Amino acid sequence: MGIFNGIIEFLSNINFEVIAQLTMIAMIGIAGPMIIFLLAVRRGNL
């Protein structure tokens, strides 16, 4: 049972809100260059 308590304690200490916010910022940050790349590849025709 000791290892399970350790895992539960580890998961309860993780701040999932910060992880979600950083994930969203990364997705938004990647979306900009992706749009520019698509515009360049398709010669401006989205």
Curated annotation (Swiss-Prot):
Give the matching InterPro entries. PSII_Ycf12_core-subunit
Q: Does the keyword Transmembrane helix apply?
A: yes
Q: Where does the UniProt entry say this protein principally localizes?
A: membrane
**What biological processes does GO assign it?**
photosynthesis
Which ranges does the record mark as transmembrane?
A: 21-38
Mapped to this chain, the residue ranges on the Lumenal side of the membrane are 1-20
The annotated topology with respect to the bilayer is: Single-pass membrane protein
**Subcellular location(s) per record:** Cellular thylakoid membrane
**Positions of modified residues (N-formylmethionine):** M1
Supply the alphabetized keyword list.
Formylation, Membrane, Photosynthesis, Photosystem II, Thylakoid, Transmembrane, Transmembrane helix
Pfam families xref list: PSII_Ycf12
Record keyword Metal-binding present:
no
What the record says about disrupting the gene is: No visible growth effect at 10 umol or 60 umol photons/m(2)/s, loss of the PsbY subunit from PSII, no change in O(2) evolution under medium light, increased susceptibility to photodamage, cytochrome b559 (PsbE and PsbF) is in a low potential state in isolated thylakoids.
HAMAP family given in the database record: PSII_Psb30_Ycf12
Assembly information from the UniProt record:
PSII is composed of 1 copy each of membrane proteins PsbA, PsbB, PsbC, PsbD, PsbE, PsbF, PsbH, PsbI, PsbJ, PsbK, PsbL, PsbM, PsbT, PsbX, PsbY, PsbZ, Psb30/Ycf12, peripheral proteins PsbO, CyanoQ (PsbQ), PsbU, PsbV and a large number of cofactors. It forms dimeric complexes. Part of a photosystem II (PSII) assembly intermediate complex PSII-I; crystallized from a strain deleted of psbJ, it forms monomeric PSII before addition of the oxygen evolving complex. PSII-I includes 3 assembly factors not found in mature PSII (Psb27, Psb28 and Psb34).
Q: What family does the database annotate?
A: Belongs to the Psb30/Ycf12 family.
Q: What is this protein called?
A: Photosystem II reaction center protein Psb30
The organism encoding this protein is: Thermosynechococcus vestitus (strain NIES-2133 / IAM M-273 / BP-1)
- What is the gene name? psb30
